Amino acid sequence: MDEERLYNDQEDSVEDEEQGMFEHFRLNVDVGQTPMRVDKYMATHLEDTSRHRVQCAIKEGYVRVNDKIAKANLFIRPGDVIRFVMPYRRRGLEILPQDIPLNIVYEDNDFLVVNKPAGMVVHPGHGHFEGTLINALSFHLGISQGPEAADERMGILVHRIDKDTSGLLVVAKNDETQLDLARQFFEHSIERRYVAVVWGNIKEDEGTITGNIGRDPNDRLRFKVYADEDGRGKHAVTHYKVLERFGYVTVVECKLETGRTHQIRVHMSHIGHPLFNDERYGGSEIRKGTIYAKYRQFIQNCFELCPRQALHAKTLGFVHPGTGKWIQFDSQIPEDMTAMIDKWRNYVNFVGTEEDDE
């Protein structure tokens, strides 16, 4: 048996929201292999993967034999090629359950939706082994070793958001739900809307940014936009709509069509409007406005009110894996962002700004 992992994007501390949550596999069936059900064959040849989990993947259409979607009762033959996608499961970390308060927006037997605060790392690793969302979920779900243990009740990440981005995340409670939600993310049918504050006065009331996103070769913790002809990066699309203008900054709603690492941050920076106070992409410096000391102090006060990139995952919608009905969740913009936005609103009302269309 020849097993090949086609890719696994687990580099450094930054992972792709969608692609980093999946592993792609290929199994080449040996010439001497006797006929066997494909689900049994896969469970036998995959480490730490149950037959039940394989059957869930087959049910969701993740498994292909000789490039055709397979059913669980299909018998494989010598020379067959099995290709499949499995939602990624980290291994090798023992999770410490921690009683950390969680803002759970919704919960049932299949999944929960949590409103993550800014500053909380989603998953342990790379210097963050405690105080993460997974540590908190482990305690909440009553699991001794947390979401890395072989426990069917475990919380399973389907996507993630950056440490300093606040907002909604869905966490599956079982394999069937994870695979169903993973498929929806994979097919880009999930509704994800963010609210951001960006530098500059965006010219158009709404627009679409399309550009491949890949790692910056000069900084492994940054990403950049590549032209199609470069053949680098992954296809990414962000739709934006202006919500409020303050001359030197703009409040926008961003809708993700894809979910690449730092996608909104990279795309907005690419068109000359980095997120307010986004240190990694140039938003933690004064990009627009006057040179006067009072203005510089005003900006510093805004940075202190919202000491992170001004980005909140506000809306999350998807088809409920159990009922098949569309379900959507909304969250309030957190206090640090609203305080900063209010300060800008007051500034414009009392001081005004220069016209700064771009």
How would you describe each model-predicted region?
Residues 1-217, 333-345, 351-352, 356-358:
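RNA pseudouridine synthases
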Residues 32-33, 148-151, 230-232, 293-302:
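Short, glycine- and charge-enriched coil/turn segments that flank and shape catalytic ligand pockets
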Residues 59, 117, 123, 129, ...:
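Short glycine/serine/threonine-biased micro-segments
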Residues 84-87, 220-222, 235, 295-301:
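Short Pro/Gly-enriched beta-strand edge/turn motifs at strand-loop
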Residues 104, 198, 239-242, 275:
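Conserved hydrophobic positions within beta-strands
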Residues 151-183, 190-191, 214-273, 304-358:
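The conserved catalytic core of RNA pseudouridine synthases
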Residues 275-318:
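RNA substrate-recognition surfaces in RNA-acting enzymes
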